[in-house]
A protein has these predicted regions:
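Short, C-terminally biased terminal segments at protein or domain edges
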Residues: 1-96
């Protein structure tokens, strides 16, 4: 389970980085969604680790709080990037 958690955690940041490097907003959103999925996977593993006794409640709470903060940050990336897609679509339509 530790390896799966490490892979999920590294996938979060890797997908955000790849999204930042993409040229179009639609591509960025795609990678931010992949990052979001990896974060949900990690949160699931945290719950399992707590339930089977690998994590005590205090450690789980601290890690869950960090995961929830990361979730809010990712949601911000997604909302802002989606708004830029919509904004560009409106500009393109006006220029036709």
């Amino acid at each position: 389970m530790v390896d799966q958690m490490r892979r999920a955690a590294s996938s979060i940041t890797a997908n955000v980085a790849e999204g930042f490097g993409r040229q179009t907003y639609k591509e960025k959103v795609q990678f931010y969604y992949h990052s979001h999925g990896s974060l949900n996977e990690l949160k699931n593993f945290l719950l399992i680790a707590k339930d089977i006794g690998y994590l005590n409640q205090k450690d789980f709470d601290a890690l869950a709080e960090q995961a929830n903060l990361k979730h809010k940050i990712l949601q911000g990336f997604l909302q802002k990037t989606k708004s830029l897609i919509n904004h560009n679509s409106l500009i393109t339509r006006k220029n036709r």
